[in-house]
């Protein structure tokens, strides 16, 4: 005990020195944009020890990949998920003194009382903390407090970013707080129990360590997956998540909900959806979506996160388990070499579902069907929307092939010369070549034989789908039965302007004001992404329907959507700059100091990308020609005459101008369906929309 007390006072002294010496907040320059990296640096500091932090993170990354992953596969295959959860519950229950003292020392009396009640209830009714009846029966929620939060409440600045191997703290203040967390954790004083503050530690028991690793690795994998700079993703997500913790967002949100229910103010009566009048000029099919609720087109679009794979979790087994047969685990990742001496491109494949059997137990004959799916900007096979779309198709009898968007770093680095995307004719030719290679690869291994193939894409992938339809009409190479584009932009120039406006919508605010505006929405999003909602049905009760309405003001919704588009472009540009250098950029992609480069990359607008970066890829082509050939108006003849082409769109998609809507409608006529709401992809969670997609592909 004395050892921990001495260490605690020592680290407290260091904490005050470092905290006073440096603050995380950076003075705001009103002439500069509010970008993702600027917000990250405002919350976490400018990372002057970036080289050291990246080196330490590399150790964590190595352990997660080469120790935690194989150990987790074995452990989670032997130990069912409920047992792993119960062990975690016991560890959390024994950490009660840490959370209670943290609340007491910052005069958060309600939190201290709730933590004490939780400990008493879970230790008795919950059988030593194995179960959590305090949460599930009596709505007594954990504050998730620690001493880092206490020090923050005392006004101690976080200091600079400090990453140490396998520790959950990410700055000087929170690292010092870990010592106090350990000293006040009951597991520290129970032989062979160990403590749960660190991911792994010499004083942890083997069981605690392995259990923590199996849980931590899954979170780590989600944070760094699909990243070409793991440290950047990790720091970014850790910084934002820590801000939610410091504000005790989950605790306050749950208590607010409980109090409103007790007061009879929840569930609130559903706000009526404003009437959407079918335009007089519309010739295509009109699909009315009821009970969507009020909201701007961008607010509608944020509901994309509600479109999730349904069979993507197992009650009995964690994701690493060999017995977990959820939809994501049935995905086969396969690699293609597009060019010699270039990184291979990974594509995803799901086999057709098992055939139904007749009364004699024999498989019922069926057609072999393959759906090729092209995601939008930043979309890769493991991400949420492509996975949900693939599951929708797979459940309805299709084998599914998913190819990463051209607007990803993976696709860019696999292309010859690391060519930048955005010129529709070139991108579509490259995608068609990859589809052909993937089909040959699948046939070689007898995963498909002679399937009936349909091509579908959404957003930017929808544009590629329509351009490939034109290429196939002029030079048939694959033989698609049908094409379906969902919410394709018409004009990349117009779409780029809209995306830039959204990303710059909060430039008038100080960084802290931006954080205050978006943090609640970020918490709501994280809560929704943790649990998949069933498809929305219009005959649901008002209580059920209310769960699908996300709270985000129009300005915040626009800013978050713009950040997503910009971050996808940033990751792609970073990969290209690392590969061959991009002349307009002034900072080099140095291995251990990249913060200034990211600040520069984040400020690049889509307009600037087209004029300075994409145009330089085609020195003999004028910019207006690049725009014109990347516009769906250039495909007017094909769209009008090819009966295999279908489009599903939202009448209020913010990436379409009024002229764009009229062009699509007059050109496609009865082969386009307009939904009354949804913005850009924000209605895919509606059962009615999902059924329409499947019907259009028949």
Question: Model-derived features: where do they sit?
Answer:
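Alpha/beta-hydrolase active-site loop
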Residues: 421-445
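Short, surface-exposed "cap/lid" segments of acyl-processing enzymes
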Residues: 352-356, 361-408
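N-terminal cap/lid segment of alpha/beta-hydrolase-fold proteins
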Residues: 278, 283, 290-363
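A structured, mid-to-C-terminal "fold-capping" secondary-structure block
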Residues: 29-43, 149-266
């Amino acid at each position: 005990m004395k050892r921990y007390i001495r260490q605690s006072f020592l680290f407290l002294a260091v904490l005050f020195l470092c905290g006073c010496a440096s603050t995380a907040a950076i003075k705001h320059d009103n002439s500069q944009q509010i970008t993702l990296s600027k917000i990250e640096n405002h919350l976490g500091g400018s990372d002057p020890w970036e080289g050291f932090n990246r080196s330490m993170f590399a150790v964590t990354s190595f352990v997660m990949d080469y120790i935690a992953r194989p150990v987790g596969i074995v452990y989670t295959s032997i130990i069912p998920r409920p047992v792993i959860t119960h062990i975690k519950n016991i560890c959390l229950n024994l950490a009660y003194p840490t959370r209670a003292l943290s609340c007491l020392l910052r005069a958060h009396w309600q939190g201290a009382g709730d933590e004490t009640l939780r400990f008493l209830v879970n230790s008795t009714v919950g059988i030593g903390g194995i179960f959590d009846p305090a949460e599930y029966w009596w709505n007594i929620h954990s504050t998730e407090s620690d001493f880092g939060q206490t020090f923050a409440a005392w006004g101690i600045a976080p200091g600079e970013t400090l990453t140490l191997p396998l520790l959950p703290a990410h700055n000087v203040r929170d690292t010092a707080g870990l010592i106090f967390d350990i000293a006040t954790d009951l597991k520290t004083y129970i032989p062979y129990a160990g403590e749960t503050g660190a991911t792994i530690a010499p004083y942890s028991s083997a069981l605690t360590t392995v259990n923590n690793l199996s849980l931590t690795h899954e979170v780590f994998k989600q944070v760094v997956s699909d990243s070409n700079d793991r440290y950047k993703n990790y720091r970014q997500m850790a910084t934002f998540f820590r801000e939610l913790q410091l504000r005790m967002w989950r605790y306050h949100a749950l208590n607010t909900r409980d109090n409103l229910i007790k007061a009879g103010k929840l569930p609130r009566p559903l706000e009526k959806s404003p009437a959407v009048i079918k335009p007089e000029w519309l010739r295509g099919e009109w699909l009315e979506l009821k009970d969507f609720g009020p909201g701007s087109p961008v607010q509608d679009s944020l509901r994309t996160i509600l479109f999730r794979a349904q069979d993507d979790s197992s009650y009995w087994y964690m994701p690493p388990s060999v017995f977990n047969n959820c939809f994501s685990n049935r995905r086969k990742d396969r690699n293609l070499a597009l060019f010699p001496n270039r990184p291979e491109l990974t594509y995803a494949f799901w086999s057709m579902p098992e055939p139904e059997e007749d009364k004699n137990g024999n498989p019922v004959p069926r057609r072999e069907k393959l759906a090729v799916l092209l995601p939008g900007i930043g979309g890769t096979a493991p991400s949420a929307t492509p996975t949900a779309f693939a599951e929708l198709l797979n459940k309805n009898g299709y084998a599914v092939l998913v190819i990463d968007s051209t607007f990803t770093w993976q696709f860019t680095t696999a292309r010859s010369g690391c060519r930048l995307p955005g010129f529709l004719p070139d991108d579509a030719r490259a995608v068609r070549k990859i589809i052909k290679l993937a089909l040959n690869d699948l046939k070689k291994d007898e995963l498909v034989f002679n399937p009936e193939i349909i091509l579908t894409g959404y957003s930017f992938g929808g544009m590629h789908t329509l351009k490939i339809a034109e290429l196939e009409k002029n030079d048939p190479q694959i033989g698609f039965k049908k094409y379906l584009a969902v919410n394709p932009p018409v004009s990349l120039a117009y779409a780029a302007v809209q995306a830039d406006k959204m990303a710059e919508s909060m430039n008038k605010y100080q960084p802290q004001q931006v954080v205050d505006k978006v943090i609640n929405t970020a918490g709501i999003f994280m809560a929704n992404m943790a649990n998949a909602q069933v498809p929305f049905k219009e005959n649901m009760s008002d209580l059920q329907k209310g769960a699908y309405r996300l709270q985000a003001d129009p300005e915040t919704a626009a800013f978050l959507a713009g950040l997503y588009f910009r971050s996808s472009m940033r990751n792609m540009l970073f990969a290209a700059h690392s590969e061959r250098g991009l002349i307009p950029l002034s900072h080099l992609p140095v291995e251990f100091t990249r913060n200034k480069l990211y600040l520069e990359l984040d400020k690049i607008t889509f307009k600037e990308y087209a004029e300075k970066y994409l145009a330089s890829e085609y020195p003999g082509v004028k910019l207006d020609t690049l725009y014109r050939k990347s516009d769906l108006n250039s495909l007017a003849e094909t769209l009008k005459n090819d009966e295999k082409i279908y489009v599903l769109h939202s009448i209020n998609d913010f990436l379409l101008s009024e002229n764009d809507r009229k062009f699509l409608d007059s050109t496609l006529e009865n082969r386009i369906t307009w939904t009354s709401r949804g913005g850009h992809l924000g209605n895919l969670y509606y059962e009615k929309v999902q059924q329409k997609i499947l019907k259009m592909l028949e």
